């Protein structure tokens, strides 16, 4: 598996010829020129996870890509987007993508909770090779190989980020959702996630593929 981080929550996961793109949002960059995608998967409707301005060009460049999103986002986007519900299993070539979670993390009690689908990607070697939770602290209750773990968010304290990484306890983790933090300050968050957990924590270089 190869992972490429395009900033914030946008990840490209490549399994041989099968290429999955998660959450191409407004805080992400460099995904515009990607071609050959097998699927585009959206966790939820917030703009930092789906940039509706740049999305049409991405779809034009990837006419064969299957398009999946949480039910609320799929309803907003319309056809050909498909709604993904908790419990769904999406067969994508040699992969199986499972939909789990269902709800966005609480930002404030007065702000309505929207839908959020977390994705578990399984290959021939691991049932949960990769997990992309979106904006949620969902614990799948099974061993995850690589977790794309939220590093910072308006809905999360650093203590909660540490506790989440401890709870999932993946073999490896890469941070996402860090665009809201100034680049010079991100080391504070990464340091806590590295020092206070036993997970192999690796910061991905932006727009460069890393093999796992």
UniProtKB/Swiss-Prot annotation:
It comes from the Bacteria. InterPro entries: Metallo-B-lactamas (IPR001279), RibonucZ/Hydroxyglut_hydro (IPR036866), UPF0173_UPF0282_UlaG_hydrolase (IPR050114). This is Protein Rv0786c.
